[in-house]
Design a protein with these regions (language model features):
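Small-residue-biased structural context
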Residues: 1-192
Length: 192
């Protein structure tokens, strides 16, 4: 599998997380309960898999090699800006989850779940839009064979560094299992 195909494979996982985030948001807006712990798990996956691992591979390995090919630097600049948007949404979600958790510890009622619902929805929209644009870009790279075998091998080595930076293969596998756990929760059951 090429490094480009590897990134598109990650996008399949990331989109599944987007479905979970959207479902959580929809349920919260409908005043239905979603366990705080489940939303915290989704937040961890956003931070560790999407940001540290996947965006790390793109930002530290893939984009530096492809940015000077056929004027791709403007596309890559936009993707980097979008990555920062995703990070900001995830941080704002985390901030609201900390407040919610604090209210639980103190035995008080968390006043409004609307900010959590809003940031989950924003993240789901970000994921859908961003991965669609990146897949179009990656397909262009693949179709035009813009990466040499040597470049592919070099990027692959950096991918391994990104995997180690995010906790290694066992941690990535754990994050995959956590997403499967979320997908099988009762509040996800009526998702088509």
């Amino acid at each position: 599998m090429s490094v480009t195909s590897d990134l598109m494979k990650d996008h399949l996982f990331v989109r599944r997380l987007g479905v979970v985030a959207q479902r959580c948001s929809d349920k919260l807006y409908a005043n239905e309960d979603i366990p705080l712990e489940d939303i915290e798990v989704a937040s961890v996956i956003m931070e560790e898999f999407v940001d540290v691992f996947h965006h790390g591979k793109e930002e530290k390995a893939y984009f530096p090699v492809t940015k000077d090919k056929n004027g791709f630097s403007e596309d890559i600049r936009k993707f980097l800006i979008e990555h920062e948007l995703g990070r900001r949404i995830a941080r704002m979600l985390r901030r609201e989850l900390v407040l919610w958790r604090k209210s639980v510890r103190e035995g008080s009622r968390y006043e409004s779940k609307e900010p959590v619902a809003r940031f989950l929805k924003s993240y789901a929209v970000f994921i859908s839009d961003h991965t669609t644009k990146e897949d179009t870009f990656f397909n262009l790279i693949e179709d035009k064979k813009k990466l040499s075998v040597e470049e592919d091998k070099m990027i692959r080595k950096y991918y391994d560094v990104c995997k180690d930076h995010s906790g290694g293969g066992p941690r990535i596998e754990e994050l995959l299992r956590l997403l499967e756990y979320l997908e099988h929760m009762p509040w996800m059951e009526d998702v088509a």
